[in-house]
Amino acid sequence: MDRFRVESRTIAAIGYDLAAGVLEVEFHDGSVYQYDVPHAIYEGLLDAKSHSKYLRDHIRDVYPFRKIR
């Protein structure tokens, strides 16, 4: 999945697979997580003033995830 860089203290890059409904988040520490989220949530993350805060408040502990690296 292609990811693109974002301006964030904790998040390095974000990608989304529309067909699978999977958000991929790469953190500055090198870890990568995938979250099963609807496209609207992905768009909300992109539009958020703080990507980290949006992830914490609207995605983490709400949607299924897996650590892939």
PLM regions: where:
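Acidic/histidine-enriched, beta-strand-rich ligand/metal-binding domains
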Residues: 1-69
